[in-house]
């Protein structure tokens, strides 16, 4: 079996396409309640639990742009702070 890949944003638009199209990759789609990218301990827990070899970071806010304009702090938190947290954890776990 291929290496396990943790997909953040497992309920999002891109993850939905991956679920439909994927035929060969070993993907684990993390839901928000399993992997809160704003919480370092939440990210650590899922990594320790499923032991992925790769993280495919798909969590965050994207379109429509009105979402960002309506709540800019949420957009910054998810897209910048969340991504920074994923990067820190990847470095810590050598992923």
What do the predicted segments below correspond to?
Residues 84-95:
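Conserved Rossmann-fold NAD(P)-dependent oxidoreductase catalytic core, especially the SDR/UDP-sugar
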Residues 8, 62, 83:
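Ser/Thr-centric signal marking residues that sit
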């Amino acid at each position: 079996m291929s290496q396990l890949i943790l997909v953040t944003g497992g309920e999002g638009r891109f993850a939905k396409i991956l679920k439909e199209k994927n035929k060969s990759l070993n993907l684990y789609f993390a839901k928000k309640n399993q992997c809160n990218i704003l919480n370092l301990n939440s990210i650590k827990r899922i990594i320790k639990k499923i032991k992925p070899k790769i993280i495919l970071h798909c969590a965050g806010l994207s379109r429509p742009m009105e979402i960002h304009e309506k709540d800019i702090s949420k957009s910054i938190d998810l897209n910048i702070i969340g991504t920074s947290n994923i990067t820190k954890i990847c470095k810590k776990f050598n992923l």
